[in-house]
C-alpha cells in the first residue's frame, strides 16, 4: 500500500493536500485538479511552462492530481527527452517558479540534500499564507 508522507498540519494533524492548479494565458479561469488531457487542451501551453532547466514543479502522486503536499522537483531539461512541442509535463504538473542563478549547483542536487534558504525575487505579493 502506498503511503504518502507530506506536510502534516499541526492544527488538524492531517496531511495537507494541494490541488493541481494550471492557468492558460488569456484564459479567465484557472483550472484545478484537471490535466490538459482531461480538459481536451492538447496543444495549449500553460502560463508557467516547463520550458527551461530549473523550472520548479509541484509533485503529486500518479494516482491523483489533487494530493500534492510538500514535495516539489526541479525540471532538468534534456532536449532528447523533451522535444520542442511535445512536452508531456506541461498540463500534468504545475510549475510555480524558475531557478535564475546557480545552475551548476542545481545539477548536483540529490534527494538527500536540504534547502537552507530561498529568496523570492518577484511575486511575493501573491503569496497567500496559510491558504
What residue ranges belong to the model's regions?
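Cross-family detector of peptidyl-prolyl cis-trans isomerase
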Residues: 2-131
